[in-house]
Amino acid sequence: MTLSKEHKAAVITQFGGNDKNTGKTEVQVALFSRRITELTGHLQQHPKDKHSRRGLLMIVGKRKKALKYLQQVNIARYRQVLADLDLRK
């Protein structure tokens, strides 16, 4: 259920600029979103997996907090992340 190194590196370079910039809020939100999609697929196959469901809810909360922080700090970067990840309609 974890991201492979190649997928993680691709997400980091896409949203962070280079492979060393992992602390950027956009990178963290993108990684959270990627893990959320993977866990959602896992939970569709295994609906009784309550531990993974709890992990999914925790990751959703972390992404929500990171997006709220990004919205308060820089609204332009927030809107760009939403557009790139197709999070809001």
Curated annotation (Swiss-Prot):
GO MF, one annotated term: rRNA binding
GO biological process, one term: translation
Keyword Chaperone: no
CC per GO annotation: cytosolic small ribosomal subunit
CDD domains: Ribosomal_S15p_S13e
Membrane-spanning ranges: none
HAMAP family (UniProt xref): Ribosomal_uS15_B (MF_01343_B)
NCBIfam families: S15_bact
Subunit structure and binding partners: Part of the 30S ribosomal subunit. Forms a bridge to the 50S subunit in the 70S ribosome, contacting the 23S rRNA.
Function: One of the primary rRNA binding proteins, it binds directly to 16S rRNA where it helps nucleate assembly of the platform of the 30S subunit by binding and bridging several RNA helices of the 16S rRNA. Forms an intersubunit bridge (bridge B4) with the 23S rRNA of the 50S subunit in the ribosome.
Family of this protein: Belongs to the universal ribosomal protein uS15 family.
Protein name, entry field: Small ribosomal subunit protein uS15
Protein encoded by which gene: rpsO
